[in-house]
Amino acid sequence: GGQQFSLAKSIGKNLIIYFYPKDDTPGCTTEGLDFKNNWDFFTDNNFTILGISRDSVQSHENFKQKMEFPFELLSDESESVCKMFDVIKPKNVYGKTVLGIERSTFFIDKEGILKKEWRGVKAANHVNDVISYLKEILET
């Protein structure tokens, strides 16, 4: 909580970075809980999970504690990381177009190379798709 994160310092780790729209909302809670419920798979296979949204550090701390997430949630209030991964997209909310985070997940390998991206995903069953892909690459 409250610490700076550096992608460069994560070389040597397999990263699963998922971007989600908002803390403590139904879809984002579902997605986070699916990552939590499959925590053993990720840790047993040396994957580090990071969730990112534009919510504040305090909001993340509250959400993480409430849901007992075993992984870190990173705050990107400035949208710099969101823009780097190109996940800020126009959305239609109650008839108005607003800019928001498109639910997306990225797999970055130990060398820091982007290996897979899932963009514009639905929260339900998304984590299963990620795990299926990772199981395939673990077998090769």
Predicted regions and their residues:
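Chalcogenol-based redox active-site neighborhoods
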Residues: 1-140
